[in-house]
Amino acid sequence: MFPALETHLKQTIPDPYEDFMYRHLQYYGYFKAQRGSLPNSATHQHVRKNNPQCLLNGSLGEKDDLIPDTLQKEKLLWPISLSSAVHRQIEAINRDFHSCLGWMQWRGLSSLQPPPPRFKDSPASAFRVAGITDSHMLSLPHLRSRQLLYDELDEVNPRLREPQELFSILSTKRPLQAPRWPIECEVIKENIHHIEWAPPQPEYFYQPKGNEKVPEIVGEKKGTVVYQLDSVPIEGSYFTSSRVGGKRGIVKELAVTLQGPEDNTLLFESRFESGNLQKAVRVDTYEYELTLRTDLYTNKHTQWFYFRVQNTRKDATYRFTIVNLLKPKSLYTVGMKPLLYSQLDANTRNIGWRREGNEIKYYKNNTDDGQQPFYCLTWTIQFPYDQDTCFFAHFYPYTYTDLQCYLLSVANNPIQSQFCKLQTLCRSLAGNTVYLLTITNPSQTPQEAAAKKAVVLSARVHPGESNGSWVMKGFLDFILSNSPDAQLLRDIFVFKVLPMLNPDGVIVGNYRCSLAGRDLNRHYKTILKESFPCIWYTRNMIKRLLEEREVLLYCDFHGHSRKNNIFLYGCNNNNRKYWLHERVFPLMLCKNAPDKFSFHSCNFKVQKCKEGTGRVVMWRMGILNSYTMESTFGGSTLGNKRDTHFTIEDLKSLGYHVCDTLLDFCDPDQMKFTQCLAELKELLRQEIHKKFHELGQDVDLEGSWSDISLSDIESSTSGSDSSLSDGLPVHLANIADELTQKKKMFKKKKKKSLQTRKQRNEQYQKKNLMQKLKLTEDTSEKAGFASTLQKQPTFFKNSENSSFLPMKNENPRLNETNLNRRDKDTPLDPSMATLILPKNKGRMQNKKPGFTVSCSPKRTINSSQEPAPGMKPNWPRSRYPATKRGCAAMAAYPSLHIYTYP
């Protein structure tokens, strides 16, 4: 321990780690305050658990005047925990140590010089003799370390303290971390910001009249391109690198140049955060055809749109038609309207996004180019002002910058930052931060902290489903408030919140995929950490959390494009002990928000195609209440909100209802839980009756009806089909495709040219004829060979021919088999006999008296079939090892059976 003592005696500057971090952050422009303003966050875990008041306010950019030095408090806590004997030992050590310091001052030594040798070992020896642990030594002011923490008083091995919270040394005046874009993307240097606004009156669905115009798609042939992105990463390419600001160089002006003040051409733009528009074609004075950009590095998923128009005219009726949507069904067919944002309205009247549009029609594209079918969305609109800047969107945008501004305000709040810890979970493919929030009140004891259950919430795994972010914002607003219910929830739960799982997709304006070109919500089982870091680290974090404590609930916030209202997808539990328990939370949520949430739209069937989703993977990991919350892009068909669009406030209120339902779900008085469970059983009974009635069957449910599989009763979910977005990331898939193409080309070179059926038949007949002729020739050849064997054996006495002539007529296909292995009554293959011509049969029988030619299915002995006379050849028997005494050998040919005897 003495080197540590010597080091601390030398130090006159702040902690080296903090000094290094100060210089590092100052170099990159993130910190310009005084060194003394660094917050003291080296808090002992034991102190934090027993003294919640000592929890650091890590968000302040100045020295915390509200919270005293926690290390000083920690130092005062040690005497409470130690015995009187240890107190006396520590006091003796302190006296010895201070005497050492006094001797140094008396000798005029600098604090940077070590003590003399005779005092060198004295303090450390005293500590070792007293048996004081390292953590006790840290209580001394001169031995205190801000980087080493001890969980217990008798802990020997220290641990490094956790990094300081994000934004803890930033203020709201400092710039945020700029979003990183793929290097192929051009980005305009403008800050796009929208105000939040709730319309005072309900925004009703559009009521189709039946006479809506269906414009014919004409494209560039008859129209004029007024906006088009030059460089768009398409299918076949893949993400390589990113940078702040995207593509290097000067940002080109893609919109057309106006010819004068009378030119009424609209100026389009979408090269900003979450923007998505690839091309605009002017087909008439006030009519435009729009083409959306697909998700980067794919050719799919065109649903989300968000773009800007300028140079508007107030009294004109404009028509916009999006020509390349991919989903055959949409909420636009049942009255959903697009969103409009007027910059002049926001500046002058404080009015934000609102639903606008008439003559709305969703229909199939009439173009047939042999590719996948496209669908069109057309609507008309009148802009409120001349020369206005307006935005259109599929739903209320919520960008990555919006999230960072919100988290920065939380980190700089002196109260909220005490129970909300902000960390970096990981970095995305482009290098953007994936944030993790841990929200809980400090516990009084370690036992109380360990007894807390966890709740995991996440959003924006699909970047185009911005409604998930608004629900998450409503949840955070409530759980971080000073409401008594929020304080109670923080007392009994540890909340792990992932507000944006796919920041890259949100930044570039994707609808469903990440920069890997794949749907992240199908890869929660992945092992490819480098390709899917956000999902891999999320699953790993939850896995570690399950090892520490029970996770009561997991919920992933999504958006739905084909069904109205809000509903949940869950997982049926096969454990009879917890039968129907997974449906209690959704039913409670339905009761708390009856005009928004539809329990009858919920589904709990686990499909094979959903095995890679977060909901199913977390359920497989042991989280019983694992859900996907689907909030519609449209509105409600329930209660007082029937046939009205959802607003931002409606979605944020759902976040509050989630918190309220959590309290009901965990109420010590289980009356609500029991009532919901009984109601669920009755609903299930009615559903079973309905199913059997549809099948025309009658069933008695008074018995063990609960044994009926719930998956058989429920229909499949109407969720999105992302099968095309499964599989390897794009860069690996491209490599696999290249290898497959090379294999196909290699095989193609070996293959012969294709033939017609007539040619194949002629070739087949010719081949069969050649085989028959060959079999006939083999029969004559083998018969001649057998007659040769019957001649005088002296033929083999010639040394020159003895080794050559027998091999001359030897057929390599000759197979010798032991005749004793076949029963005498077993018939030979009749098909073999038919292949021998009658004339050859007679000739062979006449020329080979020493051989028996069997062409009949049964062996018989007659005058024409006499056994061969006994003779013993004078060549060594070892020359034919397969021949044994007393055994007959059969030389088998494709069309002939010849029996020889030794």
UniProtKB/Swiss-Prot annotation:
Compositionally biased spans, kind Basic residues: 746-758
Region of interest: Disordered: 746-770, 796-879
Binding-site positions, Zn(2+): 462, 465, 558
Needed co-factor(s): Zn(2+)
CDD domains: M14_AGBL2-3_like
Gene Ontology BP annotations: protein side chain deglutamylation; proteolysis
Pfam families: Pepdidase_M14_N, Peptidase_M14
Keyword Transit peptide part of the UniProt annotation: no
UniProt key word Cell division: no
Gene3D superfamilies from the UniProt entry: 2.60.40.3120, Zn peptidases (3.40.630.10)
UniProt keyword list: Carboxypeptidase, Cell projection, Cytoplasm, Cytoskeleton, Hydrolase, Metal-binding, Metalloprotease, Protease, Zinc
Cofactor binding description: Binds 1 zinc ion per subunit.
Catalytic site positions: 630 (proton donor/acceptor)
Domain Peptidase M14, first and last residues per copy: 396-666
Regulation of activity: Inhibited by RARRES1.
Gene Ontology annotations for the cellular component aspect, listed alphabetically: centriole; ciliary basal body; cytoplasm; cytosol; microtubule cytoskeleton
Enzyme Commission designation: 3.4.17.-
Cell location: Cytoplasm, Cytosol; Cytoplasm, Cytoskeleton, Microtubule organizing center, Centrosome, Centriole; Cytoplasm, Cytoskeleton, Cilium basal body
Compositional bias annotation for Polar residues: 853-866
Function noted in UniProt: Metallocarboxypeptidase that mediates deglutamylation of tubulin and non-tubulin target proteins. Catalyzes the removal of polyglutamate side chains present on the gamma-carboxyl group of glutamate residues within the C-terminal tail of tubulin protein. Specifically cleaves tubulin long-side-chains, while it is not able to remove the branching point glutamate. Also catalyzes the removal of polyglutamate residues from the carboxy-terminus of non-tubulin proteins such as MYLK.
Stated family: Belongs to the peptidase M14 family.
Complex formation: Interacts with RARRES1, KIF11 AND MAPRE1.
Record-given protein name: Cytosolic carboxypeptidase 2
Organism, as annotated: Homo sapiens
Name of the coding gene: AGBL2
